[in-house]
Each structure stands twice: as structure tokens, then as C-alpha cells.
Amino acid sequence: MKSLGKHLLAEYYRCDENAINDVQKVEEALVKAAEIAGATVIGKSFHRFEPYGVSGVVVISESHLTIHTWPEYGFAAVDVFTCGDHVDPMKAHEYLKEVFQTQNATVETILRGVLNIPDLRHKPGGSCITGNCGDKKIG
């Protein structure tokens, strides 16, 4: 069985409340996590809620990273979804745990697009976001 991607669902408990309530720090952390994982960042959007909390997304050529924080509980929910073979979502997860000074974390990995075929014609990543994957046209 082949899969098109890996989706990490992480829960970070007892985080540094100031770190996960600082929209600039959260944005910088997610962008750097994507880069450490080997992904190509193509966009981002973050929002700080009043009185506290941050939500954000980093769009990568290989899929996305998202975060939703509850500083009042020291909690953050993080998704790292990557496609292709050159990105390591666990590197992003490990980096984010460190940056947010997480005391306890859980992570679940889900394989996405599990296909029962001998070989994948194409595994998304890189320039394939546009539908042009070298000599293969997608869509």
C-alpha cells in the first residue's frame, strides 16, 4: 500500500503561555518548523484573538501546517500535513515542542491517500502545486 502523504495531529500540553499567545512568535515558529522539515513555504495567515489565543496556517507546496492555541490552558493543537518523500513532518513537530516549551505532547500520524496500487504515478510536492509536475500533467 502506498500513501500520498502523512498527517501529524499533535497536542501540546503545559506550554509557555506567553509563547503561544504571541502571534509573531507563533508565526515565526511555524514558518521555521516548515523549513526545518524540508518544506517550501508559499503562504501564511495568522490571527490573534482577544483576550488570548492564536490561530494560523502556513501553506507549503507539500500541504500545510496549522495551529490553534489556548494560552489560558497552556494548550496548542498543531497539524502538520505533508506530501512527498522529501519532507519530514516529525522534524517540524519536534522543533515546535521545543519552541513552545511543551511539558507534555501527544502525536498521532495518519497516512493520507492510502492507495492499493503497485506504484504511485506521482507523489505531490515541489512545483506540483500548480498541476505541472515535469512531464506529467495533473488534473
From Swiss-Prot:
Cofactor annotation remark: Binds 1 pyruvoyl group covalently per subunit.
Catalytic activity line of the entry: S-adenosyl-L-methionine + H(+) = S-adenosyl 3-(methylsulfanyl)propylamine + CO2
Function: Catalyzes the decarboxylation of S-adenosylmethionine to S-adenosylmethioninamine (dcAdoMet), the propylamine donor required for the synthesis of the polyamines spermine and spermidine from the diamine putrescine.
Recorded metabolic or biological pathway in which this protein acts: Amine and polyamine biosynthesis; S-adenosylmethioninamine biosynthesis; S-adenosylmethioninamine from S-adenosyl-L-methionine: step 1/1
Gene Ontology annotations of biological process type: spermidine biosynthetic process
Family under the similarity heading: Belongs to the prokaryotic AdoMetDC family. Type 1 subfamily.
SUPFAM superfamilies in the cross-refs: S-adenosylmethionine decarboxylase
UniProt KW keywords: Autocatalytic cleavage, Decarboxylase, Lyase, Polyamine biosynthesis, Pyruvate, S-adenosyl-L-methionine, Schiff base, Spermidine biosynthesis, Zymogen
Domain of life, source organism: Bacteria
Modifications made to the protein after synthesis: Is synthesized initially as an inactive proenzyme. Formation of the active enzyme involves a self-maturation process in which the active site pyruvoyl group is generated from an internal serine residue via an autocatalytic post-translational modification. Two non-identical subunits are generated from the proenzyme in this reaction, and the pyruvate is formed at the N-terminus of the alpha chain, which is derived from the carboxyl end of the proenzyme.
A GO term for molecular function: adenosylmethionine decarboxylase activity
EC number per UniProt: 4.1.1.50
Oligomeric and partner information: Heterotetramer of two alpha and two beta chains arranged as a dimer of alpha/beta heterodimers.
Bilayer-crossing regions: none
Cleavage (non-hydrolytic) (site feature) positions: 62-63
Residue numbers bearing the Pyruvic acid (Ser) modification: 63
Cofactor: pyruvate
Source taxonomy: Bacteria, Pseudomonadati, Campylobacterota, Epsilonproteobacteria, Nautiliales
Protein name as catalogued: S-adenosylmethionine decarboxylase proenzyme
InterPro entries: AdoMetDC_C (IPR042286), AdoMetDC_fam_prok (IPR003826), AdoMetDC_N (IPR042284), S-AdoMet_deCO2ase_core (IPR016067), S-AdoMet_deCOase_pro-enz (IPR017716)
Catalytic residues as annotated in Swiss-Prot or TrEMBL: 63 (schiff-base intermediate with substrate), 68 (proton acceptor), 83 (proton donor)
